Amino acid sequence: FNDDPAWLVLSTAAYLKETGDWTILDEAVPYENQPGTETPLLEHLQRCIQYTLDRIGPHGLPLIGRADWNDCLNLNTFSDQPGESFQTTTNRDGNVAESVVIAALFILAANELAQIMAHLGRVEDSDQLKGQAAEMTETIKRSAWDGEWFLRAYDHFGRAIGSQHNNEGQIFIESQGLCTMAGVGVKEGAAKKALKAVNRYLATDHGILLLQPAYSQYYLHLGEISSYPPGYKENASIFCHTNPWVMIAEAILGNGDQALDYYLRINPSQREAISDLHRCEPYVYAQTIAGLDAPSFGEAKNSWLTGTAAWNFVAITQWILGIRPDFEGLRVEPVLPSGWDGFTAARKFRGVTYQIDVRRIGRGSKIALTVDGQPIKGTLISSPSSDKVTVNVTIG
């Protein structure tokens, strides 16, 4: 699963942003839990980046391995034996099949590690990482743009997956959200096109589908994803874990209305109004909601078995409300839905309580902050003067 290294970098960056505890980078961590192999966590992060760079495929994209985040997209398994594990079986050398999702995660991880290195004063390392992220960005633009949306992968035969030229599985949610989060095509308008395609082809009243059209039969070269009935699990259900990536992507593009709309579509308490259909506890997310192709479209499946709650918390608090930790302080950058006049929030961050009051004063999107009555430049609060801070934010 060649996406794994990126998540260590991203989770460490999230820890650093929240706590400001840079000493964790010096912690000695073993490899594969083997005593005597310990090196500092920072070295592990560097190795994570190099792991991907050492595994690049024919189109310049990262090799997928057995799978990536979607552990049912098994492009090197080719299993024809009932009962055989898709996750542990490999019948191809793995030197061709590539993942656009891993490419996007690599960009995110490399840019985060670049900021970590800059904080540590390692400017040369930081610049190198930024260059590697920029190169992968160009690779996605060159090799993974399908005209209206981002491809999902290339298979063992070098054929595109998630392309308008496919009969089934023409568009996938993951690469649209993650590529936008990574900044790919944001300035050029490609990200905007990709999110429009999500809205047109994947969005439903019950959430955003993982892919469309659903796979109608088992495909040896695709693996477990095509073994499920259409509309269930990874085969075109509403896979809730991925929906917040699109919410975040919409917020990045300034689309607060669309971000909130998607948030509410899968929100458990919101769906209690249709509990006879949803059939899930009103206080918990499900892994999936049956998709358009399923007989039980809109019915929740596998409650609790998901990372959706954590990701939706990030989407609503850090990107729609816009209160998010950064390496050098707390950033307040709301993307308000048009129907909101503002909001108030209290945020405890690194021993300081921030009382935040956000008000819309016009139709524009210009953000201005005052901290304890004093205007500041930008949206980052880096040097609070006490353990209780009042933040006033105007938008318009």
Regions found by a protein language model. Name each.
Residues 1-3, 87-103, 159-182, 186, ...:
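Solvent-exposed loop and edge beta-strand segments that line ligand/cofactor-binding
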Residues 6-7, 14-100, 128-157, 193-222, ...:
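Active-site acid/base region of carbohydrate-active enzymes
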Residues 1, 16, 42, 53-55, ...:
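A general structural signal for short secondary-structure junctions and capping/turn motifs
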Residues 105-225, 264, 268-297, 348:
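Catalytic cores of carbohydrate-active enzymes
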